[in-house]
């Protein structure tokens, strides 16, 4: 009997079951332990990708002090509106909402997404002070303003964002200041900062085992029978069922994914200076502020992406590299 070759399983079971995400707005399950007072995330819209030439600032790199071709992602950052404040207390079963307060003047388009309370039913800010002793977390309820972008919709997305700070009282004081106001990306992040991106990936529909799991394509008689791309064995006789670990066809893409430690290369307020000739594919022109992120960001154009402060950032040894050039040439292929 010959020696068995090392053959790791195809694909990863870490993200099973690979099914469609319930909503287009990603869930934020963890937050950075940051004592800086302010929002710890910001929702944006993906415009597209381009490329930049960065000056390599790693002195030990073979390309040190030279221009390096780098793919970058452009995200449009329309201002968000702080519509409400919510307080949580810590219990043995997790966080429990104590109370919430909404701004007096709310955007009429928010009614497309939520059932807004009547004016006489709204709680005042005093309701927050009454439960301050129990509270352990303060979060802001913000909504986007897609009508100011080129995205053809008016219904906003609503995101709950944690407010950082050294104490609950300090966080609540900041929350009261921003209630009902609009915030820009520059109020939350700055150029050179390390962030995480959360979004729903591009959907691929129903795909076979080879594309979905990366199993081996069979040749010989399997190809002649027209079954070269199927799973060779889906399990033993017993147990008399198919295990969940078997690579089978099914949904691929449209999953929530988090990518860690991306660097913000540039923040800007004039979208015209970053829009390529003819606009971004499937998006158009950037009409508001923008942020340029090094590398790729998950999801198609127009997809909502949440930028969050990094939860596992490594030591930043070299800092923000100098940008020599950002391409604004046409992406239309001509």
UniProtKB/Swiss-Prot annotation:
SUPFAM superfamilies: Translation proteins
Biased composition (Basic residues): 1-10
Keyword rRNA-binding included in the entry's annotation: yes
Residue span of region Disordered: 1-21
HAMAP family linked: Ribosomal_uL3_A (MF_01325_A)
Homology family: Belongs to the universal ribosomal protein uL3 family.
The protein's name in its UniProt record: Large ribosomal subunit protein uL3
Gene name of this polypeptide: rpl3
């Amino acid at each position: 009997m010959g020696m068995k070759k090392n053959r790791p399983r195809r694909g990863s079971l870490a993200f099973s079951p690979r099914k469609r995400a319930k909503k287009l707005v990603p869930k934020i399950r963890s937050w950075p332990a940051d004592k800086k007072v302010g929002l710890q995330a910001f929702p944006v819209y993906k415009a597209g990708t381009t490329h930049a030439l960065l000056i390599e600032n790693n002195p030990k790199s073979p390309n040190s002090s030279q221009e390096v071709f780098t793919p970058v992602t452009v995200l449009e950052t329309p201002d968000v509106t702080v519509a409400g404040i919510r307080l949580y207390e810590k219990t043995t079963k997790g966080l429990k909402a104590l109370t919430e307060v909404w701004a007096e003047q709310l955007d009429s388009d928010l009614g497309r997404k939520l059932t807004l309370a009547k004016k006489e039913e709204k709680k005042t800010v005093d309701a927050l002070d009454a439960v301050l002793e129990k509270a352990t977390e303060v979060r802001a309820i913000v909504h986007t303003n897609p009508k100011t972008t080129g995205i053809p919709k008016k219904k906003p997305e609503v995101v709950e964002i944690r407010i950082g700070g050294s104490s609950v009282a300090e966080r609540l004081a900041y929350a009261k200041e921003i209630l009902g106001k609009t915030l820009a990306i520059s109020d939350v992040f700055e150029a050179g900062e390390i962030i995480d991106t959360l979004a729903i990936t591009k959907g691929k529909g129903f795909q076979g085992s080879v594309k979905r799991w990366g199993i081996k394509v069979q040749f010989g008689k399997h190809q002649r029978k027209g079954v070269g791309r199927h799973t060779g064995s889906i399990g033993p006789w017993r147990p008399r069922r198919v295990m969940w670990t078997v690579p089978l066809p099914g949904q691929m893409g449209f999953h929530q994914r988090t990518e860690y430690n991306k660097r913000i290369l540039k923040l800007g307020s004039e979208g015209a200076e970053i829009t390529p000739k003819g606009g971004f594919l499937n998006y158009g022109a950037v009409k508001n502020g923008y942020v340029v992120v090094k590398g790729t960001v998950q999801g198609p154009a127009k997809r909502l992406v949440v930028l969050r402060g990094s939860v596992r950032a490594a030591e930043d040894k070299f800092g923000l590299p100098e940008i020599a050039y950002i391409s604004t040439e046409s992406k239309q292929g001509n």
